[in-house]
Design a protein with these regions (language model features):
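Eukaryotic, polar/proline-rich low-complexity intrinsically disordered regions
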Residues: 1-240, 244-247, 252, 260, ...
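PHD-type zinc finger and closely related Cys/His-rich zinc-binding mini-domains in nuclear regulators
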Residues: 105-108, 184-185, 189-360
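Conserved beta-strand elements of beta-rich interaction domains across eukaryotes
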Residues: 154, 168, 238-239, 263, ...
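Conserved catalytic-core motifs of GNAT/GCN5-like acyltransferases
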Residues: 294-295, 470, 484-505, 509
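A conserved beta-strand-loop-helix scaffold within acyl/acetyltransferase catalytic domains
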Residues: 355-441
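Conserved acetyl-CoA-binding loop-helix of GNAT-fold acetyltransferases
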Residues: 444-457
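Conserved GNAT acetyl-CoA-binding A-motif
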Residues: 457-473
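Conserved active-site tyrosine of GNAT-family acetyltransferases
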Residues: 478-482
Length: 516
């Protein structure tokens, strides 16, 4: 077995990719650092893509050379045995350019995104027209920072510009300010321009499900640590695990099923039909579920999804009915919003197109800010863009890269997004936060701390017990001292076996207890 598992495997050598030098000195905003690994062989080393070149994320694993797996113990485990140096862990890394590149200096606003998408022109003229007689009330010019008013030469946010023209002064995203600012000439509203940008094929592609097709139907990376090697294969889904990660001493005889394929309550996999919980993603037998007849379901929630217990119902209802898309005002002119791709596919029902367009537009801005901070991160085996799929909460037929449970928290001031964090709320026990980043121009100003305080307050409102993060070894002390995180205790380590949490090579998981 040792001979087979080592055949074709080459020595991996890791090259350190430098972390961001612009960390918040005052709050020590931790920056996640990944390693760029290259597999060495007798073949020529493939060229590394220029950081400024747009890479093409491959969604079909079958396009890569065939990946033979060595299985043992009646096909219960798989061993990576690849000859091609472009496959495997070499694809997980940060391709960073110069941190002072122009895209990092652009304000993270919806207007800046519209300019970059060529939906509107920078310095293009906009106006507000009277609803009574159709006369022009105010004129302005589109800037990345906002709208330059022609009468007072002040740069205003779209909300402020609309209020300046005599409209409502509310900054609430549910107030149709963008719908009443028109582009001169075409007379299209700013809202129509945002909708047009979202409907562009490139933006629509960002929201697609990642269906991975391959000759081997099982994942090549462990769902718990994301590393290959000798893997236990679930007999019901694509998931694979290391024995050590699952705390299994011997390979199970007969059929073996992962935690996501067995009943959450009885731990069995049988012929009885099992439902999948809309919130935590775990399966369960109706007969095992307590108090099912006592539940009250909100029929306005799309798909009328079932839940495994009352705790998941409470978390889901609070998220989808009171938190997603709602702007929360903070001190000193800041606000924060919890975003998620708002469509029927992902179980969030929004009956107002205006709010949906605003949320989706902010997600587009948030993704670009996050990639400016971390670079483009690709999954080792499937080649998908991890950050993009996390921000857009894209689903997949591979559990390890199924990110449909993610939410994005954004911190804003003066119409600009200054900090972004990605969260996956599994249930009342565990929430993970694999990414958080501040805009380049707003670092060393405590932005991550502001957003972290808001996030933790909301998690306490949801009665969440623990917040889990992956950190590089170099940043663990910063997380501990500045944000109150600690190493995983034995109880949490056992709990995480039953969760699909995003993990990176060489990262260290930390936890913060939110509720005593």
């Amino acid at each position: 077995m040792a001979e087979n598992s080592s055949r074709g495997r080459q020595q991996r050598k890791s090259d350190r990719v430098s972390s961001n030098d612009s960390d918040d000195d005052r709050t020590k905003d931790p920056d996640y650092e990944l390693r760029l690994s290259r597999r060495h062989s007798n073949r020529n080393t493939p060229p590394i893509r220029d950081a400024n070149q747009e890479p093409v994320a491959q969604h079909t694993a079958s396009e890569a050379p065939a990946v033979p797996n060595v299985r043992r113990k009646r096909d219960r485990s798989a061993s990576e045995n690849r000859d091609d140096e472009t496959t495997g862990e070499a694809w997980r890394g940060r391709f960073r350019g110069n941190s002072s590149k122009p895209s990092s200096l652009k304000p993270a606003t919806i207007l800046s995104w519209l300019i970059d998408s060529q939906t509107v022109e920078e310095n293009g003229e906009v106006m507000v027209i009277s609803a009574m007689d159709g006369n022009i009330i105010k004129k302005g010019k589109i800037k990345r920072e906002g709208i330059l008013c022609c009468c007072c030469t002040k740069t205003l946010t779209p909300q402020q510009f609309h209020a300046h023209a005599g409209g409502t002064s509310s900054s609430d995203d549910q107030n149709p300010n963008y719908d009443r600012i028109l582009i001169s000439g075409s007379r299209k509203s700013m809202l129509s321009c945002m909708d047009e940008a979202l409907r562009h094929p490139s933006e629509r592609h960002n929201r697609e499900t990642n269906f991975i097709s391959a000759e081997d139907t099982h994942d090549s990376g462990c769902i718990l640590c994301a590393i290959g090697g000798d893997l236990l294969c679930c007999d019901s889904c694509t998931s694979t695990y290391h024995q050590a990660c699952m705390d299994i001493t011997e390979v199970p005889e007969g059929s073996w099923y992962c935690p996501y394929c067995i009943c959450k309550f009885c731990g069995e996999m049988d012929d009885d039909w099992m439902n999948k919980c809309h919130q935590c993603g775990r399966k369960y037998h109706l007969k095992c579920c307590q108090g099912l007849e006592e539940r009250e379901f909100d029929l306005n929630m799309v798909s009328h999804a079932l839940y495994c217990d009352q705790n998941c119902i409470e978390v889901s209802v609070k998220l989808e009915k009171t938190l997603v898309g709602a702007k929360n005002e903070l001190e000193e002119g800041y606000s924060w919003t919890l975003l998620r791709q708002l469509d029927h596919q992902h179980g969030v029902y929004i009956d107002k197109d205006y709010q949906r367009i605003i949320c989706d537009s902010k997600l587009a801005v948030a993704w670009r800010l996050m990639e400016d901070s971390f670079g483009q991160v690709f999954d080792s085996y499937t080649k998908i863009n991890v950050i993009k799929n996390v921000i857009y909460n894209c689903s997949s037929n591979f559990n390890r890269i199924d990110f449909k449970g993610f939410y994005t928290a954004v911190l804003e001031t003066n119409g600009e997004i200054v900090c972004v964090a990605a969260l996956r709320i599994h249930d009342k026990k565990i929430v993970e936060m694999p990414f958080i980043a501040a805009h380049f121009a707003h670092r060393r100003k405590g932005m991550c701390r502001k957003l972290m305080i808001a996030i933790e307050s909301t998690l306490c409102y949801l009665n969440i017990e623990k917040l889990i993060i992956p950190s590089t070894p170099e940043k663990t002390e910063s997380w501990k001292k500045k944000y109150g995180f600690g190493v995983l205790d034995d109880e949490t380590k056992k709990q995480l076996i039953n969760y699909n949490t995003l993990m990176f090579h060489d990262a260290v998981r930390l936890q913060k207890i939110l509720l005593p």
